[in-house]
Amino acid sequence: SVSNIPESIGF
C-alpha cells in the first residue's frame, strides 16, 4: 500500500 507504515510490501 502507499502509506508511511511498513506493510507486507510497502508499495
Curated annotation (Swiss-Prot):
Cell location: Secreted
Keyword Cytoplasm in the entry? The reply is: no
What biological process terms from GO does the record include? defense response; positive regulation of leukocyte proliferation; positive regulation of smooth muscle contraction
Effect annotated for changing F11A? Abolishes mouse splenocyte proliferation
Annotated keywords: Amphibian defense peptide, Secreted
**Which tissues express it?**
Expressed by the skin dorsal glands.
Keyword check for Plastid, yes or no: no
Transmembrane stretches, start-end: none
Which coarse location class applies to the principal site listed for this UniProt protein?
secreted
Q: Coiled coil located at which positions?
A: none
Sorted alphabetically, the Gene Ontology cellular component annotations on this record are: extracellular region
Give the UniProt family note. Answer: Belongs to the frog skin active peptide (FSAP) family. Rothein subfamily.
Give the protein's biological function.
Induces contraction of intestinal smooth muscle in isolated guinea pig ileum. Induces proliferation of mouse splenocytes.
What protein name is recorded for this chain?
Answer: Rothein 1
